[in-house]
């Protein structure tokens, strides 16, 4: 494992669930010759060399693909409702200490920037009283404010989350004009860091009403009074993979990246 020169153990969990309504077998979807979960693991490994990286899985088919590539994995329960629950089980059975840092990197984000992963790991390790941490960037486009698939958030003066919503927050009472400054509007990026103590507390609490209404698990933490530190990032990373159309988009981007890397100068 790595402690990033802090003395605090850092673990990276990549949850990977085989079942998906929109894209069955999603972790094993072929992305330009490699299963998606292997590409995510490769990104994390390059960004955080020497880190304690574990893929938390629920299916023998994922295990076979990872084993063939020498990627460390752990089998977790098929009943988990979220990657957070899967990460919490792994941390619990592994005996990680309460103060250990646990980074949760989604297994369907094969294009997450390595610089973002490194910066976020450093951010979490540097927090002296880390409970939960996540990432936000400027919304950038006014059309996204009313898009429920884009989660918005507001923070306090210390940079801690006050609320997350699929609605446009903060609401502009006087209306939004074309070309209006969107500097006060933030969108959520789904990376999470926890102390293991906070992770276990979150996973052992039933969903709250706000979480169920918005379908946003992080609202459970706010409902419990747990602080969420928010790291600012300049822009949104490429979207993850949820549908067959997403697969085609990501494959195209990967092929373009490969071509750019191999073209002579």
From Swiss-Prot:
Protein's UniProt keywords contain NADP: no
Keywords: Cytoplasm, Lipopolysaccharide biosynthesis, Nucleotidyltransferase, Transferase
Subcellular location per the Swiss-Prot or TrEMBL entry: Cytoplasm
Catalytic reactions on record: 3-deoxy-alpha-D-manno-oct-2-ulosonate + CTP = CMP-3-deoxy-beta-D-manno-octulosonate + diphosphate
Molecular function via GO: 3-deoxy-manno-octulosonate cytidylyltransferase activity
Enzyme Commission number(s): 2.7.7.38
Name listed for the protein in its UniProt record: 3-deoxy-manno-octulosonate cytidylyltransferase 2
Species this chain originates from: Burkholderia lata (strain ATCC 17760 / DSM 23089 / LMG 22485 / NCIMB 9086 / R18194 / 383)
């Amino acid at each position: 494992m790595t402690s990033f020169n802090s003395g605090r153990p850092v673990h990276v969990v990549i949850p990977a669930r085989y079942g998906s309504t929109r894209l069955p077998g999603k972790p094993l979807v072929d992305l330009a010759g490699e299963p998606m979960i292997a590409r995510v693991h490769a990104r994390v490994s390059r960004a955080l060399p020497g880190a304690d990286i574990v893929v938390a899985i629920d299916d023998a088919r994922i295990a076979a693909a990872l084993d063939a590539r020498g990627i460390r994995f752990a089998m977790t329960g098929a009943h988990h409702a979220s990657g957070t629950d899967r990460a919490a089980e792994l941390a619990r059975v592994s005996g990680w200490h309460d103060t250990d840092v646990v980074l949760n990197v989604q297994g369907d984000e094969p294009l997450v920037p390595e610089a973002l992963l490194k910066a976020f790991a450093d951010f979490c390790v540097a927090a002296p009283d880390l409970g939960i941490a996540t990432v936000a960037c400027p919304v950038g486009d006014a059309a996204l404010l009313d898009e429920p698939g884009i989660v918005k958030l507001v923070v306090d003066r210390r940079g801690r989350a006050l609320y997350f919503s699929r609605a446009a927050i903060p609401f502009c009472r006087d209306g939004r004009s074309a070309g209006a400054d969107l500097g006060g509007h933030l969108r959520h990026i789904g990376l999470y860091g926890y102390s293991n103590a906070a992770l276990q507390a979150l996973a052992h609490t039933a969903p709250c009403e706000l979480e169920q209404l918005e379908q946003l698990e992080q609202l459970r933490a706010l409902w419990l009074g747990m602080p969420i530190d928010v790291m600012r990032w300049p822009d949104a990373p490429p979207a993850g993979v949820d549908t067959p159309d997403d697969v085609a988009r990501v494959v195209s981007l990967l092929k373009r990246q490969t071509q750019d890397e191999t073209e002579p100068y």
